[in-house]
Amino acid sequence: MSTCSSSEIAEKKRIALAKLQAKKSQLLASAPATNGKSTTSATGATQHANNGKSNPNQPQAKSPLNFYRSPTGEQKKINRSGPTPGDNKSSSFLNALKAIKQTSNRELSRGAAHPYQRPNGGNERNKPTLSLSSDKEKPVAVLLGNSITCNLYLISTHRFAAQTSGYHEQLVTVFKNMPTKCYDGQTRIWSFDLSDYQSLKTHAADLKPYVHMNGIPKKVLDLCGQPPVVPERSVLASIEPKLADQLMPFQQDGVCFAIAQKGRIMICDEMGLGKTYQALAVADYFKDDWPLLVCTTASTRDSWAKHIMDLLPKVPIHYVQVLNNNQLYVGEAKVLITSYNMMERHEDKLMQRKFGFIIFDESHTLKNSKAKCTTTAKRLTDQAKRVVLLSGTPALSRPLELFTQLQMIDGKFMNFMEFTTRYCDGKQSTFGWDANGQSNLEELKVILHLKYMLRRTKVEVLPQLAEKNRETVVLDPALVWTNAETKETLDAFNKELKTAKGRATEEILLRFYARTAEVKTRAVCAYLKTLVKEQKKFIIFAHHRVMMDAISDFLSGLKVHYIRIDGQTRSDHRSDSVDTFQKKSSCKVALLSLKACNSGITLTAAEIIVFAELDWNPSTLAQAESRAHRIGQTKPVICRYLIAHNTADDIIWNMLKNKQEVLSKVGIFAENLQKATHTAAPTSSHKIEEYFSPSTSTSLEPERNSIKQYFSTIPAKEPPEQNNNTEMTKVNKAESDIAAFFNDDDDEAFLELDI
């Protein structure tokens, strides 16, 4: 729902009051013409009352409490408080006083609820009087035209657009007089060259107060007015030859652009395009500004150290240090690699070292401006000369997450209020300043790509890369809803979500998310059993421990060789597990934590990626997909999302759709999860549609393993005891069929596995 500013509310109120006063004046102006009729009617009624004659069949007229005449004009105008036929003088006078008292009380009640104070004498305007005298009323001029808002924003480095909240003829005339005008009939948006910006604002200023113009910030215009920076490829000659020779053409372009921006840049290429190589190349070019600080996730510290020693052989090994619990001495290290947690804990030591070049890997970790880790990073960047931020997903769900990262590159661009008001639809709410929205995203995209951010997708720079396809697999409901208690629990969560508001919704959804993981375990394991038979290497991503433990136990029971990496896996064991999956053909499955392993590892040996659970952010899922779909992948990759209907999956999938639309407008998310092919998991039960559309099912009797067997409440016509025995027999038979499916380990496919 759109909101109005206080100035817009005041303007609309003023216009409404003016129109009301004008209407009132018009009615009062016509009062003399009808005054004679009212007087005649009143006199006749008085004489009739004095004679004591009244017609019992004639209904008594009641005094109206408004100024409006009869639509037909044929009915006589009755004085507001004058005597009516059949009434005597005293009763007429008492009725008039009663009407005045009732109207006065109504006016007081209405005035108390009004958000603004009425003008002086405002309470008197609708009170009934004993006459229609217009001596106190003065005509008010009627305002012509409507008040609208016109928002101006950039759509490219040399053009801007104008979007209006309504139609205004004079404003359209101003648009048509601009030399570089262009009108889009589909979106109904005007666009112009930046050379017409000042002229348009000057002419639109004459239309106040009917047109309120929201202009482009001066800082944005100044940024567009700067001469373009032309990268020079000659700078590549100053980079370590071993590293420069391994850079692909698009990576060389990225290095040149970063150097042209004086080493303060966000490299946000899509996952798997070698951001690490580009960052090290830029750091090597500015090696005179070292010492170098690399902040990354805890699981990728050793990987960074390995890359530095391999790609920059001129850096002595003893000058490269990894900051961990065992190595807390910073000393004279030329290159220090630390996790974000260790950076926060040892802020003072790092500040004393005065690093001149800083690399923040997975920089979206710093999205929260109030987090201690972010404030530490901001202090370090303030004293550093060069800052490079690396992230394939710089914002996970909303534009606000970009602010802190932009501040680390250019702290003078915009402050918090300016940025959130312009690009986050910032406004004051009951709970404070609300900056979780989005606005002017096209302009934000232009600014990011103009100076601050470098982003390329795999489709753009690696058209020869193996294809990636997505599929959503609907799990067998008979394996999800295994008892009546499960169905009641899920139904209860769905009902709570429909009535909950605010933070209560988030809490319920989190519990719903955890419960969904529990009920999906059997169905997920059943699907994995069919997948193992294909003898292809695949990755399984899960989040909750209950899901990971269930899959781990299931694979162990099938005697499948697999690796498991989660948040508790040590970094040295982590790298060994990755090597095992990549190099050993007998290792078929990699069971990974969705949070701990969505970045920083390469598993191109996998052909299939399975998501046993969803995540709140589309960027997290895209990062996880890129563990296999990246440089070095030679086979097509299939990403399968296992969905259970009527669970939290339905809600989260819709949330992912909305978030990816916002991120796509900013130009930092190129994937489309909604284009996934929909399939159904193999099931021995009846058609899957009957579980979700029972009204259209043509089956009269429940089939084997049908979910209806467990929740049927229609009693049969047989005796109660016999009915109970029959139902128990059906349930036991269904459960035995499911158990037989899981315990069927004598398949020929398993005998051929290379274990």
UniProtKB/Swiss-Prot annotation:
GO terms for biological process, alphabetical: DNA repair; heteroduplex formation involved in double-strand break repair via synthesis-dependent strand annealing; regulation of transcription by RNA polymerase II; replication fork processing
Highest taxon in the source lineage: Eukaryota
Cellular component annotations (GO), alphabetically ordered: nuclear replication fork; nucleus; polytene chromosome interband
Pfam families linked: HARP (PF07443), Helicase_C (PF00271), SNF2-rel_dom (PF00176)
Span of domain Helicase C-terminal: 527-681
All copies of domain Helicase ATP-binding, residue ranges: 256-412
Enzyme class: hydrolase
Endpoints of the signal sequence: none
Compositionally biased residues, Polar residues: 32-63
Keyword terms of this UniProt record: ATP-binding, Coiled coil, Helicase, Hydrolase, Nucleotide-binding, Nucleus, Phosphoprotein, Repeat
Binding locations of ATP: D269, E270, M271, G272, L273, G274, K275, T276
PROSITE patterns: HARP, HELICASE_ATP_BIND_1, HELICASE_CTER
Motif (DESH box): 361-364
Main subcellular location of this protein, as a coarse class: nucleus
Coiled-coil region list: 7-27
Modified residues (Phosphoserine): S63
Region (Disordered): 26-91, 104-134
Function: ATP-dependent annealing helicase that catalyzes the rewinding of the stably unwound DNA.
UniProt family annotation: Belongs to the SNF2/RAD54 helicase family. SMARCAL1 subfamily.
This protein's name: SWI/SNF-related matrix-associated actin-dependent regulator of chromatin subfamily A-like protein 1
Source organism per UniProt: Drosophila melanogaster (Fruit fly)
